[in-house]
């Protein structure tokens, strides 16, 4: 795995490295955990955007029940910083999609989101109960979801943290969500590839990926820093690649 972009502590939003460590800690001990191969030009990426260096580092793993764990850390010059993480489940397992994103700039963190998103209409009952029993803190600046945000669960947390205290609360929320997901990964049984429930989850994950690809901001940044063809490959093959058909 590649190391994340390095910066002095004075220029990196503290929430990004701390949340990255929280995420890495959550995948330790998952069943059959192993690195996931990726194209060599996707693991460590350098480009230029309007005179600033764009650095992207990707860490990819998989385990029993999760077809891909992806942690992306990106930095544009000394301004924009991004953390992006998705855990895509194997459709044979009744598991949601974990997603977390942080966007930060010189003024601090402007957006932070975490969710366990359903892939078959509703969350698995055990996860729904666990999330309902540990509600998100009452953050002061809750943000509106984008138009394609129907893919998220009712428990999605999308905020602009108001100061260091709320950044700590958000990290704690991500840790709670990951603990719930870890428990489910360890306990959920594999269903047959031909089961109707597996097919529904496969189709739901296809829909999730399609909706995420509608985020034109990501595509525009990548196209400017590299080119349209490369941006398409990065989005289609790495960020939101479709699951293989079950069976």
Swiss-Prot record:
Pfam families: Fe_bilin_red
Record-linked InterPro entries: Ferredoxin-dep_bilin_Rdtase, Ferredoxin_bilin_OxRdtase
EC number of this enzyme: 1.3.7.5
One GO molecular-function entry: cobalt ion binding
UniProt-listed GO biological process terms: phytochromobilin biosynthetic process
Keywords, alphabetical: Oxidoreductase
Database matches in Gene3D superfamilies: 3.40.1500.20
Catalysis performed (reactions): (2R,3Z)-phycocyanobilin + 4 oxidized [2Fe-2S]-[ferredoxin] = biliverdin IXalpha + 4 reduced [2Fe-2S]-[ferredoxin] + 4 H(+)
UniProt function note: Catalyzes the four-electron reduction of biliverdin IX-alpha (2-electron reduction at both the A and D rings); the reaction proceeds via an isolatable 2-electron intermediate, 181,182-dihydrobiliverdin.
Stored PANTHER family: PHYTOCHROMOBILIN:FERREDOXIN OXIDOREDUCTASE, CHLOROPLASTIC
Family: Belongs to the HY2 family.
NCBIfam families assigned: PRK02816.1
Name used for this protein in its record: Phycocyanobilin:ferredoxin oxidoreductase
